[in-house]
């Protein structure tokens, strides 16, 4: 259970960062949270000499955890310490619970590409149990998954979903790459975004969803306690901002689409875009010719 330290912004690589919150891992609040959330599976004493620190980038305003799990510990969190049964149970009646969201996303994709479903290739990066992809598979899209958890990969394979084992060494190219509640977990969001763009077809799109950090800084006072919010200790290591994405794509062949409703216009969709300007929990990015 080792932590590694980030000394510069993972979004823009700027070193002008400041500490905005700190809490020892051996504090009562942190021990109570980690013990409860991970159901006693983590040996918290191994973290006692470390601090949960939130830093803010002076350039792109990204808030991020300074000390984060190394690759081995991160894999253990996802595969060993997070209760798999609870994780899977949360997906009960997935399509019924999220019907409106799924229909909106499918309509958006169809409007963007204007071709038959089976001709549209989709990659879900960080696919988890694959319920999002399964909805699109049922609607005849050409779907693929990238996932790091062996348990979840086995589940995906049982549901006949094609797996991409590596986003670096693959010949596959995709029309649309989707990722939900993944980018807040990864240590290198900029590098990951650029690597995803390399397996995107020309004029393809990347859509990312993540927890909103709207007004989060107002909660950072002496009474703040760690919880499963946008700054979840050890897990939500990046609190993503639009300015952060703008910096990530500098000198790339990517551009941010501010209004998704331009492809699928309705008053409801337009108002969603207005809300997202402030709340910001999703971003649509297009690959352009340069």
What feature does the model see in each segment?
Residues 120, 203-204:
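Surface-exposed loop/turn positions
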Residues 181-185:
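A short His-aromatic
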Residues 3-6, 155, 187-195, 205-290:
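S-adenosyl-L-methionine-dependent methyltransferase catalytic module, highlighting the catalytic core
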Residues 1-180, 190-193, 261-264, 270-283, ...:
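Conserved N-terminal segment of class I S-adenosyl-L-methionine
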């Amino acid at each position: 259970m080792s932590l590694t330290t980030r000394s510069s912004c993972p979004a823009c690589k700027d070193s002008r960062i400041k500490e905005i919150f700190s809490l020892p891992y051996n504090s009562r609040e942190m021990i109570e949270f980690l013990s409860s959330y991970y159901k006693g599976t983590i040996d918290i004493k191994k973290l006692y000499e470390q601090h949960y620190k939130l830093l803010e980038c002076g350039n792109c305003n990204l808030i991020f955890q300074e000390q984060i799990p190394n690759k081995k510990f991160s894999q253990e969190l996802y595969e060993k310490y997070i209760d798999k049964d609870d994780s899977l149970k949360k997906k009960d009646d997935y399509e019924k619970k999220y019907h409106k969201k799924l229909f909106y996303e499918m309509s958006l994709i169809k409007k963007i590409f204007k071709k038959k479903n089976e001709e549209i290739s989709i990659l879900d990066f960080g696919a988890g149990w694959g319920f999002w992809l399964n909805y699109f598979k049922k609607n005849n899209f050409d779907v693929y998954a990238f996932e790091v958890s062996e348990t979840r990969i086995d589940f995906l394979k049982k549901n006949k979903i094609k797996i991409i084992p590596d986003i670096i060494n693959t010949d596959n190219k995709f029309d649309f790459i989707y990722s939900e509640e993944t980018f807040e977990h990864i240590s290198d969001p900029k590098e990951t975004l650029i690597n995803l763009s390399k397996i995107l077809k020309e004029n393809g799109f990347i859509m990312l969803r993540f927890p909103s950090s709207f007004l989060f800084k107002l909660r950072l006072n002496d009474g703040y306690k760690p919880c499963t919010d946008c700054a979840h200790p050890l897990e939500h290591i990046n609190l993503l901002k639009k300015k952060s994405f703008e910096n990530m794509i500098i000198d790339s062949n990517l551009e941010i689409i501010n209004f998704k409703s331009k492809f699928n216009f309705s008053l409801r969709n337009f108002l969603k875009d207005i809300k997202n300007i402030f709340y910001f929990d999703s971003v649509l990015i297009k690959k352009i010719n340069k």
